[in-house]
Amino acid sequence: MQVSVETTSPIERVLTISVPAARVDEKVNSEVAKTAKTIRIDGFRKGKVPVSVVKKRYGQGIRLDAVEQIMRDAYVEAIQKESIQPAGMPSIEPKNFAEGADLEFVVKIEVYPEVTLADNSAIKVDRVVSDVTEADVDTMLETLRKQNAEWSAVERESADGDQVTIDFVGYLGDEAFDGGAAEGHKLVLGSNTMIPGFESGILGAKAGEERTISVTFPEDYQAENLKGKEATFKITVSEVAEQILPELNDAFVEKFGLEEATVAALRAEVRKNMERELNQAIKSKLKNALFEGLSSINEVEVPSALVDQEVDALRKQAAQQFGGQGFDASQLPAELFQEEAKKRAKLGLLISEVIKKDDLKVDDDRVRAFLEDMAQAYQEPQQVIDFYLKNKEQLAQVQSAVLEEQVVDKLLESAQVTEVTLGYEDAIKPNAQAEEAGEEA
């Protein structure tokens, strides 16, 4: 077998492969003989069909199947011989497969790029510094009280924080529009769950009162036919209710199933959970910043096959999150995910190179610590740990996450790090919101 390799780009190769006719004939004759032993033809007993008859009737189809198999086998031999690492499926095009002649075919493939990492000292990141204060715990306890609040009907004008029960119909001009009506809708004033101007238009209304308000839909509203449009809503208020918060006492604490039903025990549990959430948020922000920095200082040509894999993964993720059961992820256009997919594929190549360059291996002690920390959020931590340790697929995901943490540590050794102090609420916000808070401070 002869192989020639042409480099058409840093991530593309063209292989021209020639297989001797004798090897092809041997494969064809072997397949014909196998077929003769199993095929049924009228006038012949099973297994007694002459090879010449099989060749005459089925020879062309058998030869085509044999040629396809030889091309696949020869392709694998060729990439092993030439030490080529494909990044995706090959495109195989036969050039000559005439009987009696050498089989010739061309293979076009994408390969993994050679990655040369830039100096990590060029990476600049902010490391968030924050802690949980007593005031933060008080705020969280107040949130718990609100989540367990009851609503009591009142005979007064509605105010911010009240819950109103309303019927409404929306109009564009004189025509009611689809999706713009509801009956018995419960709305907490000040929650900002409706478009701007809707909630403020109900402030001060009493039960039984009717109001007509004018609003303008935002330019970025999800419904295309309503973006930027002026609309009128006719609203009937059937009830105004005020929030009745439960007392923060031992009776309230009993709802949470703690071993010790005291306010002090609840404060301790709330603080522990907040500190866990805060630490996870800080680690996540730092990891994301380091990975963004790693990507920004390195140029890598990304094989389209890797981008396509990420597009498929993002499609499935979006389908699970928004589509519900039975939703066909392939309906979502690839263009929606192309940019993010390319970023992820590039980052994956860079992380792999860091692991390879620094010879990083999964730290089993860190895997155990990762599992123990994660399991603390569950009622039976040991059961969670045992589940992961006994499930190879789940354990592999944890090991991958730990290896990413080790990459983060390696990048931190040389990156330029600036500490930024944030309060708890700002520290746990997504990156963009936290950056805005930091700028305002």
Curated annotation (Swiss-Prot):
GO biological-process terms attached to the record: 'de novo' cotranslational protein folding; cell division; chaperone-mediated protein folding; protein transport; protein unfolding
Cellular localization per UniProt: Cytoplasm
Protein name, as recorded: Trigger factor
EC number(s) reported in the record: 5.2.1.8
Gene: tig
UniProt similarity note: Belongs to the FKBP-type PPIase family. Tig subfamily.
Gene3D superfamilies hit by this protein: 3.10.50.40, Trigger factor ribosome-binding domain, Trigger factor, C-terminal domain
PANTHER family: TRIGGER FACTOR CHAPERONE AND PEPTIDYL-PROLYL CIS/TRANS ISOMERASE, TRIGGER FACTOR-LIKE PROTEIN TIG, CHLOROPLASTIC
Gene Ontology CC entries for this record: cytoplasm
Keywords: Cell cycle, Cell division, Chaperone, Cytoplasm, Isomerase, Rotamase
GO molecular function, one term: ribosome binding
Domain remarks in the Swiss-Prot or TrEMBL record: Consists of 3 domains; the N-terminus binds the ribosome, the middle domain has PPIase activity, while the C-terminus has intrinsic chaperone activity on its own.
Signal peptide from the UniProt entry: none
Reaction(s) catalysed by this chain's protein: [protein]-peptidylproline (omega=180) = [protein]-peptidylproline (omega=0)
Residues covered by the PPIase FKBP-type domain: 161-246
Main subcellular localisation: cytoplasm
Function of the molecule: Involved in protein export. Acts as a chaperone by maintaining the newly synthesized protein in an open conformation. Functions as a peptidyl-prolyl cis-trans isomerase.
Pfam families assigned to the protein according to its UniProt record, in alphabetical order: FKBP_C (PF00254), Trigger_C (PF05698), Trigger_N (PF05697)
The keyword Signal is assigned to this record: no
